[in-house]
Amino acid sequence: MADVEQNVAVPDAAGNGSDAVNGTAGRFVSSPEGTALAYGSLLFMALLPIFFGALRSVGCSKSKNASDMPETITSRDAARFPIIASCTLFGLYLFFKIFSQEYINLLLSMYFFVLGILALSHTMSPFMCRVFPANLPNKQYQLLFTQGSGESKEEIVNYEFDTKDLICLGISSVVGVWYVLKKHWIANNLFGLAFALNGVELLHLNNVSTGCILLGGLFVYDVFWVFGTNVMVTVAKSFEAPIKLVFPQDLLEKGLDASNFAMLGLGDIVIPGIFIALLLRFDVSLKKNTRTYFYTSFLAYIFGLGLTIFVMHTFKHAQIRRVFTRGGAIKRGSDRI
């Protein structure tokens, strides 16, 4: 669902409607400083999950813990992904046409409430390990569900966690309640960053050609559903979920109560991010001190996203960013391998 709500006019994270491509209300004209702050903040936030998610993906690929094992995307998976995404998008479109938008978004809010708590807890876990006081006991727990008895007993759930994980879960739950009750843009971004980082960390491409297939297929998917139909725009306007990063362009004027947002869909972060993470793992596999492929593709993404923001601001159409953010990463990565 990362690409469903990308770069289109959507209701902002605080619940106020926005009716321009960059999330600006019709009569509001942002100041140059506010616009620069919003776009610069989105660019910075986009880089965080890619950089740290890629670093964590290296450790994830070496982990022997079953719960930390990454999901490997094959060429077949990449080819099918645009088809599955299209079916999901059209299914949501039909749901919003048939059923009440209020009830659908209520179900989606609860769904992303649970997912967001788990994603944010997983994101916070390494940091909690570093700041957790050494003099406090770190007790171990195990959540075990089995089916049957005796020799026919079968494990359904076997999850081990400790005190640090419970603290992370508690903090994440507070953010989750904040998001569900207020739909505040900061809570939205905390969940969005957690989703993006987990995606880059846990979704692994098996080779460069798979990444090219995935990026190319999703480019065609975006072009068709945005320019060919009104399906994506309709779903995006109706869909309320933390699947985008937002930043207010009127922050300097209204502070934290700002309501006119620029936005960046998580698909523009996660999809290029898993490709960049693949190149970092390739660098590591070469057993050299340099990270040439990773830094080259990372800089290409920065250049592509920066150019996209310029084009979007100039021509008032954000969808063109697919050409730069994904095409730039493919070209820099494939040229060097």
Where are these regions (language model features)?
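A membrane-topology feature that recognizes alpha-helical transmembrane segments
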Residues: 2-337
